[in-house]
């Protein structure tokens, strides 16, 4: 993680909350809390709803450094795992709302 973020912000990769991935592939939260194939756009919207001031950055995910991907940097609220769980929960709510509205 960049020194400029240390302590105040956290770097969130979609893989960190992806229920289709194992822990060794990058998932950080329990399966029951994780989301199936989260998109960066969903994570950004969820973080906005939670007031976490998200910023999207182009970067290579350390576990697959040869692929260029996006990451989301958000304000730190409590522990990193707590923040990841909050965002995953909000993504689930977003998907449920969209499903109900037929989008």
Swiss-Prot record:
GO cellular component terms, A-Z: signal recognition particle
Entry-linked SUPFAM superfamilies: SRP19
Localization (cell): Cytoplasm
UniProt keyword annotations, A-Z: Cytoplasm, Ribonucleoprotein, RNA-binding, Signal recognition particle
One Pfam family in the UniProt entry: SRP19
InterPro entries hit by this protein: Signal_recog_particle_SRP19, SRP19-like_sf, SRP19_arc-type
GO molecular function, one term: 7S RNA binding
Record has RNA-binding as a keyword: yes
Gene3D superfamilies membership: Signal recognition particle, SRP19-like subunit
One of the protein's GO biological processes: SRP-dependent cotranslational protein targeting to membrane, signal sequence recognition
Subunit structure as annotated in this protein's UniProt entry: Part of the signal recognition particle protein translocation system, which is composed of SRP and FtsY. Archaeal SRP consists of a 7S RNA molecule of 300 nucleotides and two protein subunits: SRP54 and SRP19.
PANTHER family to which the protein is assigned, alphabetical: SIGNAL RECOGNITION PARTICLE 19 KD PROTEIN, SIGNAL RECOGNITION PARTICLE 19 KDA PROTEIN
Biological role stated in the UniProt entry: Involved in targeting and insertion of nascent membrane proteins into the cytoplasmic membrane. Binds directly to 7S RNA and mediates binding of the 54 kDa subunit of the SRP.
Similarity comment: family membership: Belongs to the SRP19 family.
Protein name according to UniProt: Signal recognition particle 19 kDa protein
Organism per entry: Hyperthermus butylicus (strain DSM 5456 / JCM 9403 / PLM1-5)
Gene: srp19
């Amino acid at each position: 993680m960049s020194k400029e973020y240390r302590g105040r912000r956290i770097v969130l990769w979609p893989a960190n909350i992806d229920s289709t991935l194992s822990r060794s592939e990058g998932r950080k939260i329990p399966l029951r809390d994780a989301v199936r194939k989260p998109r960066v756009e969903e994570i950004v919207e969820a973080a906005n709803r939670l007031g976490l001031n998200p910023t999207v950055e182009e970067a290579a995910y350390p576990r697959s450094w040869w692929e260029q991907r996006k990451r989301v940097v958000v304000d730190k609220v409590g522990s990193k795992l707590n923040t990841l769980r909050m965002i995953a929960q909000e993504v689930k709510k977003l998907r449920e709302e969209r499903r109900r509205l037929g989008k």
